[in-house]
Design a protein with these regions (language model features):
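The feature captures the beta-strand-to-loop junction immediately N-terminal to the Walker
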Residues: 48-50
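Helix-to-loop junction immediately C-terminal to a conserved catalytic motif
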Residues: 63
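Conserved ABC ATPase "signature" region
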Residues: 79, 127-145
Length: 274
């Protein structure tokens, strides 16, 4: 099922996240060097690159978990290093994060995991928070019966969905997904892709998705950003990636596996790449 949706020209879109000239080093090793990237409101942006290129480093830097040595990061139009604590709190409440392996607390039930951000940021009665937790579970396709289960009692796909429910706990405007289909079987991964597309369309979410999953890139991403050489090499829809002349991008998006996934209309003149 092709869930891909083209975005409009860039001039018509607000950048919900804007990264300019960001450099990150660990000791003598520079991982990111003068990186620029915009994430547009309402889009699903896939972020790809070779293993070790720095995809997770950028994600953690945007989230404030890594320190940068240069550059600016603006969320919702605000420089995250030049805002007051109250403004930072407001920004944090507009973001949700799904880490690669779910990162659910093993000693807490699914419901208790979902309640963590609510308890941290909101002042609501317990009964209302419990009801909201069940609503979030329903939103990601899990039944109320999952609420009182522990992570060890869940399948891999259920863990991902429960973690996504937690990421949606505060009704964020943007969600950051780190390898959301990693470890899922092809059917489970396709179902998760469909869920992400549905949530974007129904909730108006912006989605920043770090992924190696070619199926996700071809089916749900409006645009794709490619990281290489410590910078963003290219940003654009899948059609732009297929037409790009960078050797790594050509290999990634025109390789044998990509040709098996791509629809014929997405891979023009496919015989050229055989």
């Amino acid at each position: 099922m092709d869930l891909h949706r083209q975005t409009e020209p860039e001039t018509e879109h607000e950048a919900i996240l804007s990264v300019r000239g960001v450099s990150v080093s660990f000791g003598a090793q520079t991982v990111l060097d003068g990186l620029d990237l915009d994430v547009r409101r309402g889009e699903i942006l896939g972020f790809v690159g070779a293993s070790g290129a720095g995809k997770s480093v950028l994600l953690r830097t945007v989230l404030g978990l890594n320190r940068k040595q240069a550059g600016t990061i603006r969320m919702f139009g605000k420089d995250i290093e030049a805002i007051t604590p109250d403004e930072r709190l407001a920004v944090d409440m507009k973001m949700g994060v799904l880490f690669q392996h779910g990162a659910l607390f093993s000693a807490l039930t699914v419901r208790e995991n979902i309640l963590i951000p609510m308890r941290e940021y909101l002042d609501l009665p317990q009964r209302l928070m419990d009801e909201l937790a069940l609503l979030k579970l329903d939103l990601v396709g899990l039944s109320a019966a999952a609420a009182d289960k522990f992570p060890s009692q869940l399948s891999g796909g259920m863990i991902k969905r429960a973690a996504l429910a937690r990421a949606l706990a505060l009704d964020p405007e943007i969600v950051f997904l780190d390898e959301p289909t990693s470890g899922l079987d092809p059917i489970g991964a396709a179902d998760f892709d469909e869920l992400i597309a549905k949530l974007r369309d129904t909730l108006g979410l912006t989605v920043y998705m770090v992924t190696h999953d070619l199926d996700s890139l071809f089916s749900v991403c409006d645009r794709i950003a490619v990281l290489g050489g410590k910078k963003v090499l290219a940003v654009g829809p899948i059609s732009a990636m297929l037409a790009h002349d960078d050797p790594w991008i050509r290999s990634y998006f025109r390789g044998k596996r990509a040709r098996q996934i791509a629809m014929p209309e997405q891979m023009p003149n496919a015989e050229m790449y055989s």
